[in-house]
Design a protein with these regions (language model features):
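Short loop/turn microsegments at loop-to-beta-strand junctions
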Residues: 29, 54, 140-142
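Short, internal strand/loop/helix patches
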Residues: 90, 104-140
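Aromatic-flanked redox-active Cys/Sec active sites in thiol-based oxidoreductases
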Residues: 58-64, 94
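A short beta-strand-turn-helix
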Residues: 32-54
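Hydrophobic beta-strand anchors of alpha/beta hydrolase catalytic cores
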Residues: 56-57, 89
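N-proximal helix/coil linker or "cap" segments that precede and/or mark the start of modular domains
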Residues: 5, 9-36
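Thiol-/selenol-based redox modules, centered on thioredoxin-like
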Residues: 137-163
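Structural microenvironment flanking redox-active thiols in thiol-disulfide oxidoreductases
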Residues: 69-110, 121
Length: 163
């Protein structure tokens, strides 16, 4: 399951081939965005999060859809493992902050933050969901595991939330 792969990548520092344009070994683009944790809005800053330890950025298409809800539930269940590794997990989508505040409580179970994936973030992380050559306005289901140094150590991109 994907959560075990991500946990292993954090623990072992493994590099895994990526299907996204940001390759393993690249520096993760820094950003700030609106986010929600346990229903409370705050400003997420990747630089600040990395100062505390590794970060798992996971992009998902849309809050409260079947796949995204199940993926959020899986991350929430795996949070003890991520916390044991000192990792921060944050989910990003292009949903508005009010939707994310609800999602952070109802589906993320107050266990991790979710943030607004601005157009700039979507472009710099190369996570626009494109179908038939057209940008859908959603993000792809892509996860980046970022070491505390800012280096991307794993990329996983697959619309099937079960991977």
């Amino acid at each position: 399951m994907r959560k075990l792969v991500l946990t292993a990548a954090l623990a072992l520092g493994l590099a895994v081939p990526a299907s996204a344009d940001l390759p393993t070994g690249a520096q993760a683009p820094l950003f700030t965005t609106q986010a929600a944790l346990a229903g409370q809005e705050y400003g997420f800053n990747l630089r600040s999060a990395l100062a505390k330890g590794p970060v798992v950025l996971y992009f998902y298409p849309k809050a409260f859809t079947k796949g995204c809800t199940l993926e959020a539930n899986a991350f929430a269940e795996a949070m003890p493992e991520f916390k044991a590794l000192g990792a921060t997990v944050v989910g990003l989508s292009n949903d508005d902050i009010e939707t994310l505040k609800r999602f952070s409580t109802e589906e993320c179970r107050d266990a991790f933050a979710v943030g607004v994936a601005s157009r700039r973030i979507v472009e710099t992380y190369d996570v626009a969901l494109v179908r038939n050559g057209q940008d859908t306005g959603f993000t792809s289901r892509t996860s980046y595991v970022i070491a505390q140094s800012g280096e991307i150590v794993m990329v996983h991109s697959d619309l099937d939330y079960r991977d």
